[in-house]
Amino acid sequence: MKKFLLLLTCFVSFGVLAQKAAPSPAAVATQKVGNTEVMIKYAQPSVKGRLVFGTKEAKALVPYGEVWRTGANEATTIEVSNDITVQGKTLPKGIYSLFSIPGETEWTIIFNKEAKMWGAYTYKEANDVLRVKARVSEHAHTEQFTIGITAAGQVTLDWDKSSVSFYLK
């Protein structure tokens, strides 16, 4: 009887642990832009009272001027089913990691051919396929990092009080 109760307790404990939400849950943004299917896979970190974007000296979670995985956990990926233009520059069809270099007024958006990596720890600039600039605008507070795509091709990165957009065509 004691073994049975111990076993039952273990199963219940594992069940409770399995219900705990991930700190940075996985998310997917998909949209058809013209005749191209676009899918962005990313993880959604939360602000949780922290300074998100800022200087390294201010201990920002994502320091200005440094390569960021554009999400949490594994590097964010973007898949396009056909060649497409990003801010007027051609991106061949394929799967890419999506990195960014945040700045106070402008970000660099990076499409890198190494699609499978954890974070930006092994990021190599030599593998960049395309880099484009995107403007930052102030935005209502967004607790959880969110990527959206419209049918018109606007990709929006929203987190904390920042919103960054770039365009696919």
Enumerate the predicted regions with their spans.
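Bacterial Sec-dependent N-terminal signal peptides
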Residues: 1-21
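Targeting-peptide/extracellular-domain and disordered-appendage signature
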Residues: 19-92, 97-169
